[in-house]
């Protein structure tokens, strides 16, 4: 039987109706910047909302961490979160979660069994633990598995911070398994795509690049003065901002050490310099909850450092607007949503020249990419943001333009195409592009 292009498009559109998204280790309802919640949480929620607007329903499976959580919570039309009982009703370290995989998988399979066969057209798993669950669900349901790594053990182990622990062998092996069985692997950037191919042996034809996005309705330029007033920041301050989880990978100490160097080089800055760190301890940083406070004290700069707990998006946007520069000194980032959010608010970025940050930040146009993590080098770059306001303003204009190219609607449209391609390949239907 010969299938016409119009029939192929019809098959694709009819079949892409509902996605089972698996996010075992962290709930999309958690506040980013706390525990294991970060850019991945933002990605899952924002992409799901936009997919639903395209007519693709999304059900997100995550581990239940409290008895008070409902079995199902609708977070937007067409988007629901299913809380699956697996282990104790509490937060668990990621190192303890492999022991709960069987219980979590059982809950996911029981949910699907409540409905008529064919409820889910595709599985999209996030992070390697979820990929293990997705692998087995894929075999049971006969649907394609799309997987996004978000971070990769082999990459992290190549770029370890001085105080960080290497990722365990079990994770490396688990990631290798997921790479081999997934029908499609979604990479945030071409760099990540190449890492999947070079380090994990992924088949190039199964790797798709889909850039994450930014909520341009929330993160947009507004008055810096008004933002500083709301946040009780001096109008004439030089504000250096860090946003993210406090852990060795994110390297917030690099900002503090650079600030200390700036004050040594120019003591007159002390009366106006403000270093703001928005976020909470996470991962390996949980063992040292007072780490940033201790580092600031040891450097003698406690008087210029403000530690702020994780903030909801509308408040976070104000922090970006209030800053002169957002500093992202991570040892690695698969993309770097913080950099994109800051630029969308009109604040340029000083970021480490690693991973996805090379895609998120246009060097010399929307910010500056810094090689290495030497505080002296970072101090020189940050001093330019303080002492060259005209240059900083030019970067701010470039930052807004850079972020405008990364909307979540475009991300969702690309994901829908990836899902369609995976399903067409599974059912041996040739892919046609509608005009």
Curated annotation (Swiss-Prot):
Source species, domain of life: Bacteria
Calcium listed as a keyword: no
Residues annotated to bind UDP-N-acetyl-alpha-D-glucosamine: 31-32, 39, 245, 250, 333, 341
Swiss-Prot/TrEMBL keywords: Glycosyltransferase, Magnesium, Metal-binding, Transferase
Name of one Pfam family that matches: Glyco_trans_4_4
Positions bound to 1D-myo-inositol 3-phosphate: 25, 36-41, 94, 127, 151, 171
Disulfide feature: none
UniProt EC number: 2.4.1.250
Keyword Ribonucleoprotein carried by entry: no
GO biological process: mycothiol biosynthetic process
Stretches that traverse the bilayer: none
Annotated positions binding Mg(2+): 320-321, 323, 347
SUPFAM superfamilies from the UniProt entry: UDP-Glycosyltransferase/glycogen phosphorylase
GO molecular function, one term: magnesium ion binding
Catalysis: reaction(s): 1D-myo-inositol 3-phosphate + UDP-N-acetyl-alpha-D-glucosamine = 1D-myo-inositol 2-acetamido-2-deoxy-alpha-D-glucopyranoside 3-phosphate + UDP + H(+)
HAMAP family: MshA
Subunit structure: Homodimer.
Function, as annotated: Catalyzes the transfer of a N-acetyl-glucosamine moiety to 1D-myo-inositol 3-phosphate to produce 1D-myo-inositol 2-acetamido-2-deoxy-glucopyranoside 3-phosphate in the mycothiol biosynthesis pathway.
Family to which this protein belongs: Belongs to the glycosyltransferase group 1 family. MshA subfamily.
Record's protein name: D-inositol 3-phosphate glycosyltransferase
Source organism: Streptosporangium roseum (strain ATCC 12428 / DSM 43021 / JCM 3005 / KCTC 9067 / NCIMB 10171 / NRRL 2505 / NI 9100)
Gene for this chain: mshA
């Amino acid at each position: 039987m010969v299938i016409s292009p119009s029939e192929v498009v019809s098959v694709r559109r009819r079949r892409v109706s509902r996605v089972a998204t698996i996010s075992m280790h962290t709930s999309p309802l958690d506040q980013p910047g706390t525990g294991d919640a970060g850019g991945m949480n933002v990605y899952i929620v924002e992409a799901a909302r936009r997919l639903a607007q395209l007519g693709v329903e999304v059900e997100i499976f995550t581990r239940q961490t409290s008895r008070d959580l409902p079995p199902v919570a609708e977070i937007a039309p067409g988007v629901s979160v299913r809380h699956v009982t697996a282990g104790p009703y509490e937060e668990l370290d990621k190192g303890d979660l492999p022991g709960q995989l069987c219980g979590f998988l059982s809950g996911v399979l029981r949910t699907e069994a409540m409905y008529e066969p064919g409820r889910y057209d595709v599985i999209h798993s996030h992070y390697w633990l979820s990929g293990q669950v997705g692998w087995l669900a894929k075999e049971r349901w006969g649907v394609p598995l799309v997987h996004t790594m978000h971070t990769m053990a082999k990459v992290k182990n190549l770029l370890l911070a001085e105080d960080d622990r290497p990722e365990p062998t079990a994770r490396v092996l688990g990631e290798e398994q997921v790479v081999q069985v997934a029908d499609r692997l979604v990479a945030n950037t071409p760099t990540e795509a190449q890492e999947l191919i070079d380090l994990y042996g992924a088949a190039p034809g199964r790797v798709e690049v889909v850039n994450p996005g930014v909520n341009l309705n929330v993160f947009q330029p507004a008055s810096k003065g008004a933002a500083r007033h709301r946040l009780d920041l001096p109008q004439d301050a030089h504000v250096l901002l860090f946003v993210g989880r406090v852990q060795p990978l994110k390297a917030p100490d690099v900002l503090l050490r650079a600030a200390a160097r700036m004050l040594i080089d120019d003591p007159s800055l002390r009366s106006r310099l403000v270093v703001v760190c928005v976020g909470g301890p996470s991962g390996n940083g949980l063992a040292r909850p007072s780490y940033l406070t201790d580092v600031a004290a040891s450097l003698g700069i406690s008087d210029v450092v403000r530690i702020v707990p994780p903030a909801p998006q509308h408040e976070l946007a104000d922090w970006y607007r209030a800053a002169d520069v957002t500093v992202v000194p991570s040892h690695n980032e698969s993309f770097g949503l913080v950099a994109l959010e800051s630029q969308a608010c009109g604040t340029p970025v000083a970021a480490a020249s690693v991973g996805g940050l090379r895609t998120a930040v246009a060097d010399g146009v929307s910010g500056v990419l810094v090689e290495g993590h030497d505080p002296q080098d970072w101090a020189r770059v940050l001093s330019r943001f303080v002492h060259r306001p005209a240059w900083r303003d030019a970067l701010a204009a470039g930052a807004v333009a850079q972020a405008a190219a990364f909307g979540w609607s475009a991300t969702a449209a690309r994901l829908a195409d990836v899902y369609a391609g995976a399903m067409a390949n599974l059912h041996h239907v040739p892919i046609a592009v509608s005009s």
